[in-house]
Amino acid sequence: PDVEAADVKLHWEPYQPNKFEVAQTSQAIVMYSGESKLNGKIAIGEAGMTGAGTLEFASAEVASKKFRFRKEDFKSDTASFAFTARDEVKNDGTKEVAIKTDNVKADVSFKNRQGQFKSNSADSYIEFPVNKYIAYMDELRWYMDKDEVDMNSSMNEIDLIGSRFVSTRPDQDSITF
């Protein structure tokens, strides 16, 4: 992808493959025509461009210790995803997280304008911090331009109970539906 970076730390070992690294210092690394900012680092080598850190979008964040970047997409075998409402800002200036999940395989396409996140573990869940619920589902699809998220559970085929939503509020005593 196209990358713009200022005030960065460079590390280059010309006789070693995969040893050209750019690490952000005070400003995020701007990527994908300004649609995302990486707080972290990138490395360029024979295998292409890789990176680590948190990619910020207008309404989402994807964090990983290892991204694989390509011209119109990026992937990660293990990532975290957080969906925020563009206009929902807390008193401290940070965005309110509506949906978040960890330990997912990420596949985000700027060409198709969507991201797909699949759970790496059968006991993973999706968290709704504002509503104080968690849901046992293993797939989430993010539509970038619509600010929408679809969730699915392929566990339904095995588990006849289906998707479960569980309250995390102490006064609701783990109410489930």
Predicted regions and their residues:
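Structural signature for solvent-exposed beta-strand/loop edge elements and short helix-capping sites
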Residues: 1-177
